[in-house]
Amino acid sequence: MKVTLIAILTCAAVLVLHTTAAEELEAESQLMEVGMPDTELAAVDEERLFECSVSCEIEKEGNKDCKKKKCKGGWKCKSNICVKV
């Protein structure tokens, strides 16, 4: 009974790890498309860095506060730099 339970839990853990690794590879393959040279990827990274580090310089309109730009599309803002999630 214990051996069966351990085997089932081990298989479940391997399946979860395999699925996570497959998702990461799929995301990387989408970024590294054949038609997209490294210079374009660098431009995307610079753009994301800019998006995250720009503070709000627009004056308030009425009662609305302006908002900082945020990182999007699988990136998060950390220490004013967009990093891949």
Swiss-Prot record:
Concerning Pfam families, the annotation shows: Toxin_20 (PF08089)
Source taxon at top rank = Eukaryota
Key word Lipoprotein present: no
Where in or outside the cell is it found? Secreted
**Signal sequence: where?**
1-22
Gene Ontology cellular component annotations, sorted alphabetically:
extracellular region; host cell postsynaptic membrane
**What are the disulphide bonds in this sequence?**
52-66, 56-77, 71-82
Instruction: Identify the keywords attached in UniProt to this record, alphabetized.
Output: Disulfide bond, Neurotoxin, Postsynaptic neurotoxin, Secreted, Signal, Toxin
What does UniProt note about where in the body, tissue by tissue, this protein is expressed? Expressed by the venom gland.
Q: What is the protein's major site of localization?
A: secreted
Which residues are assigned to the propeptide feature?
23-48
Q: By its UniProt entry, which InterPro entries does this protein fall under?
A: Hwtx-2-like
Molecular function in Gene Ontology: toxin activity
**Biological role stated in the UniProt entry:** Postsynaptic neurotoxin.
Q: Which family does the UniProt entry place this protein in?
A: Belongs to the neurotoxin 12 (Hwtx-2) family. 02 (Hwtx-2) subfamily.
Name of this protein: U4-theraphotoxin-Hhn1s
Native organism: Cyriopagopus hainanus (Chinese bird spider)
Provide the organism lineage as a comma list.
Eukaryota, Metazoa, Ecdysozoa, Arthropoda, Chelicerata
